[in-house]
Amino acid sequence: MKRTPTKVAKAQALTDGAALNTGLVVGSHGRHCVVETADGQRVICHPRGKKSQSVVGDRVRWQAATDEGTIEQVETRRNLFYRQDEIRTKSFAANLDQVLILIAAEPEFSETQLTRALIAAEAEQIRPIIALNKSDLGALFEASWQRLAPYRAMGYTVIPLSLKQAQQQLDHPDTNHPVSSLAQEGQAQLLALLSGQTTLVLGPSGSGKSTLINALVPGAQVVTGEISQALNSGKHTTTTTTWYWVDRIASATAQRTALIDSPGFQEFGLHHIAPAQLAQLMPDIKAHAQECRFYNCTHLHEPGCGVLAQVESESTPGAISARRHRIYQQLFEELGQQRW
């Protein structure tokens, strides 16, 4: 029987308060979170101390109290995803199988923001997927698709989508809404990649992220609203990182399909990464970093730099684009700045 998560329940109704319970963190705001139990009930919890602070996707051990639970232990994580503003690095999702970076042909996406997200995924050895929405826009989409050519050459999975057409099909299944073969192929590929996986969905405003989640998770707005209300985060539900079960996508394994929706794509930072690590997290730079004369080459100005040699011969197949190297330079300088 399909398990349907219930509304947030009082902790004391779930246990006698003596033994530790296990659960999954499905919502987080500030120091409080919502933990889902094995039978689908949801409990408001807070951490016992800094070592028990949790993020969405964490498996935790918690103890019931009078009105809410206390997280006593966070189980060992497979990985941890970070975001950052100008001052602070903050973890916000754990135990991911992959990251879906959703961008669009219109408004024009930021290649720097895309690169930041890819680097963050590479740093935690999380598989990234790039999806370019609005394939129905013709020439605008084609231009954006060409901008992503270097990323396809690096081996990243890049999928074309038309979420507008997909949504029309879902809303009006009895009406003929033509969907291009390109969009159909991309949609089928995306559903196959999501099946049985835990996927963090990232994307700037206008990319279609809400459309995607609402299409895959009927009632997603209701779930988000309940979690936000329980966590006292008010009406601004976009500030809350939320876990969704996606029962619409069948899984060939015992693992259910899940999406994690989180805001703040514009705030993506990398200050938890040292400048010297950067080249190893950008596949096109990494491919030529071993060709440098000096072992500690920064790939910015040194003589005999294998990376710079490839930038200078940009017309050569497999070479590094000048645009990508500018992004590397900007990030290297940013990560080298002193942080207080």
List each language-model region with its residue ranges.
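N-terminal accessory targeting/assembly segments
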Residues: 1-111
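Helix-rich effector regions associated with P-loop NTPase G domains
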Residues: 16-19, 56-59, 64-68, 75-99, ...
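Short, glycine/charged-enriched secondary-structure capping and boundary segments
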Residues: 39-41, 88, 114-117, 144-147, ...
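Phosphate-binding glycine-rich loops and their immediate beta-loop-alpha structural context
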Residues: 104-156
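Walker A/P-loop
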Residues: 205, 210-211, 215
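Canonical P-loop GTPase G-domain recognition
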Residues: 137-207
